[in-house]
Design a protein with these regions (language model features):
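Cleavable N-terminal signal peptides
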Residues: 11, 21-22
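Low-complexity, glycine/alanine/valine/leucine- and proline-rich hydrophobic stretches
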Residues: 382-420, 429
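A long, amphipathic alpha-helix that forms part
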Residues: 38-39, 193-210, 214-217, 222-264, ...
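Short, structured active-site-proximal loop/turn typified by the sulfatase FGly-forming signature C/S-X-P-X-R
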Residues: 40-88, 130-132
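His/Asp/Glu-rich, glycine-adjacent segments
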Residues: 85-230
Length: 455
């Protein structure tokens, strides 16, 4: 069995502090879009999640995890793996902002090379631990993940995406070999509706065959259903119950490898219901900040020039083509203030300068527009300024002090105090906590580990 008591030096906030740690195998399960209340208030909400509820009595848990800015998946996933904020690790949104072509979506931060700070995979690999991953974001091309089925969707056509997954899985041939036993990998074919069960089946086989000492698994069902139907809708509650069963299977597989294994369940963000969209870019077009080509019926609207544009994340970062253009900056500021003056637009606050820097995100933004719960920023270039939906959908991306954006954290296993309520914690504490349990040094983490260990 892989476990021992070890004293390691952990670099935190620029200091080298000695910690006695429980060095043992760790399985981290990330449940996308899961508010903590799916577990902490399960009984009150009529939810049957016995496997997740066990963590509250058998281990330590947070009532809420304050996330990062913006509270969307890719920056949050990188912070969970590094203990650093987006402005340090470099993953600033789900999609990049591409100033040279504003007519197409920019690339997604799929690649390990996009993360500029030390990850738990890196730290575990340096310590010669066996690492593995199924679908946790940001692993494509990593040299630190020995057995990896990454999240990578380069094509809207799943057969092409599957070819890309087979080509980028590590080591070469891993996914093809596993499919020979387990059948076709449909872990990111969201038309199948059993994507999480498929990921779990492949993760359990990796656990059984290769006995990784640090493994990450990402599950999406709660996020998918909450986006479509709203958080805590019957559909998202059903997804949470299905994931609870998968968590039980994964935990059992980890404990079958080593009864002293530690299992952590995290989420990247919560979700909030929303019914209104503010089409901020239409206001930018009307103000002359974005110039459009003449419209042609049946063809997409095209931007031909821009001075300021919107980088959306439920709220928005406002990017200037020329950051030194003070006239445009002043014009944008005045426009945003005018929009905020109308309560119907749902603007919560406008940030700039040091206020943006303090969020730890939105690097390069001239302004950040945070919205009130229930209102999101849309991407339309023409049409009405506001649009209302007949039924709520689920959204995230608000600034992390919005309690509906709270993420979740549960942990249980050898050395973890049972029944310990950690209260409200910071997402940047999770990676150094798991590094402490693994007995590895995470180079760039800037927060102290959570007090999860038994005295």
């Amino acid at each position: 069995m892989f476990h021992k008591i070890a004293a390691v030096a952990v670099s935190l906030v620029g200091l080298m502090t000695a910690h006695t740690v429980m060095a043992g195998p760790v399985l981290m399960i990330s449940i996308d879009g899961m508010n903590p209340e799916y577990v902490t208030e399960a009984q009150a909400r009529g939810l049957k999640t016995p496997n997740l509820r066990r963590f509250m009595t058998e281990g330590a848990y947070a009532t809420g995890v304050r996330g990062v800015a913006p509270s969307v998946s890719w920056p949050s996933a990188a912070s969970l793996m590094t203990g650093t904020p987006p402005n340090r690790h470099g993953v600033l949104n789900n999609e990049r902002f591409e100033p040279t072509d504003r007519n197409r979506p920019a690339g997604i931060y799929y690649f390990a090379a996009d993360i500029r700070t030390d990850t738990l995979w890196d730290a575990a690999d340096r310590a010669n631990l066996v690492t593995a991953n199924v679908d946790q974001l940001g692993s494509v091309g990593s040299r630190s993940v020995r057995y990896d089925i990454p999240r990578y969707e380069p094509s809207a056509w799943y057969p092409e995406t599957l070819k890309a997954l087979e080509a980028t899985a590590s080591p070469p041939g891993l996914l093809t070999d596993l499919q020979g036993k387990l059948g076709r990998y449909t872990g990111i074919d969201f038309e199948t509706r059993d994507y999480d069960a498929v990921r779990t089946r492949f993760a359990i086989e990796i656990l059984r065959r290769y006995k990784p000492q640090f493994m990450t698994v990402h599950l999406s069902g709660v996020d998918v259903e909450a986006h479509e139907h709203g958080p805590f809708s019957p559909q998202s509650l059903k997804a949470a119950e299905a994931i609870d069963d998968l968590v039980g299977q994964l935990r059992a597989a980890a404990l079958a490898n080593d009864p002293d294994a530690v299992v952590a369940v995290v989420s990247d963000h919560g979700q909030a219901p929303a019914t209104r969209t503010l089409s901020l870019r239409t206001a930018f077009v009307q103000a002359g900040l974005i110039t459009l080509a003449p419209t042609t019926p049946g063809r997409p609207v095209q931007i031909v020039d821009w001075k300021a544009d919107v980088w959306r994340s439920t709220g928005a970062a406002i990017m200037l083509r020329d950051p030194a253009d003070t006239a445009t900056r002043d014009k944008v500021r005045a426009l945003l203030k005018a929009l905020a003056a109308d309560p119907a637009n749902g603007v919560s606050r406008i940030l700039e300068g040091a206020e943006i820097e303090a969020t730890g995100g939105f690097k390069g933004a001239a302004f950040v527009l945070d919205m009130k719960s229930g209102v999101t920023v849309g991407g339309d270039l023409i049409g009405d300024l506001r649009r209302d939906r007949p039924k709520p959908v689920g959204v995230h991306g608000y600034l992390p002090d919005n309690p509906q954006m709270n993420a979740a954290f549960f942990i249980a296993g050898r050395g973890v105090a049972a029944g310990r309520n950690l209260g409200q914690v910071d997402m940047l504490q999770i990676a150094p906590t798991l590094a402490q349990v693994l007995g590895v040094r995470l180079k760039d983490a800037q927060a102290r580990p959570l007090p999860i260990l038994q005295p």
